[in-house]
């Protein structure tokens, strides 16, 4: 048991050492967010589709992932994926970078959560607007891109931002498979000091995560304001087209 007196100076001296490994933490987090969002979008589409098999498989996947603790999924991927690949393809991936295993695990988990966010946000947008756009000759893709997607993004953004922050914090578990990220480096510093300064090191980690969470929260707040003001459209013509379609939908009674 560490009986040393608390030393605030250790926090300041540890911060630069921890920040050297922040890029690994961000690599795992950002990669998982991007890949998880893409997979989550596909899952949301599958749940919204009329195809019974796709709908059932998406529901099953989401249910399993949402019921699986993050650390359990991390271990399943880290220990199970190499065994599976070796059994099926006779390839040895045991020496693969541990960041890859972490990204795979967190991608699978993140996709399940954001798929429900995307699906709920899309269903909250009046579908009559899409039908009105189609009725006046807009292509299905154009109606989705210019009408449905911007409104869906605004509705999904707050919960999506919370999920991003949660994923960033869950990523701290990656050290359990030997990944030397920010938390992994913190544990190495503690080990090098024979278990001393644990409180100070973890407080330093907490400060970094706290600042990152505040930054992400502020960034999503600004993005939400931009989307609310209709600044997602890249041109005035695109905005005018969207407004025209919305008005047509309301006039025809197909909208709200």
Question: Where are the language model's segments positioned?
Answer:
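Transmembrane alpha-helices and adjacent helix-loop boundaries
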Residues: 1-256
């Amino acid at each position: 048991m560490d009986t040393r007196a608390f030393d605030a100076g250790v926090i300041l001296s540890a911060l630069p050492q921890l920040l050297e490994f922040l890029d690994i933490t961000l690599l795992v987090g950002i990669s998982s967010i991007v890949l998880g969002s893409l997979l989550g979008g596909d899952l949301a589409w599958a749940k919204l589709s009329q195809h019974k098999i796709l709908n059932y498989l998406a529901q099953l996947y989401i249910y399993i992932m949402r019921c699986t603790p993050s650390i359990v999924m991390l271990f399943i991927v880290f220990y199970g994926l190499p065994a599976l690949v070796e059994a099926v393809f006779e390839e040895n991936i045991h020496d693969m970078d541990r960041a890859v295993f972490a990204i795979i695990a967190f991608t699978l988990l993140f996709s399940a959560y954001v798929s429900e966010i995307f699906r709920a946000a899309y269903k909250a947008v009046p579908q009559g607007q899409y039908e009105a756009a189609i009725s006046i000759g807009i292509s299905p893709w154009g109606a989705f891109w210019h009408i449905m997607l911007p409104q869906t993004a605004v509705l999904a953004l707050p919960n999506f931002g919370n999920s991003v922050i949660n994923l960033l914090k869950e990523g701290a578990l990656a050290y359990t498979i030997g990944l030397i990220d920010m938390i992994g480096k913190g544990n190495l510093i503690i080990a090098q000091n024979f278990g001393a300064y644990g409180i100070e090191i973890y407080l330093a980690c907490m400060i970094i995560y706290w600042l990152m969470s505040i930054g992400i929260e502020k960034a999503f707040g600004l993005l939400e304001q931009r989307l609310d003001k209709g600044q997602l459209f890249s041109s005035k013509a695109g905005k005018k087209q969207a407004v025209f379609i919305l008005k047509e939908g309301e006039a025809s009674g197909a909208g709200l």
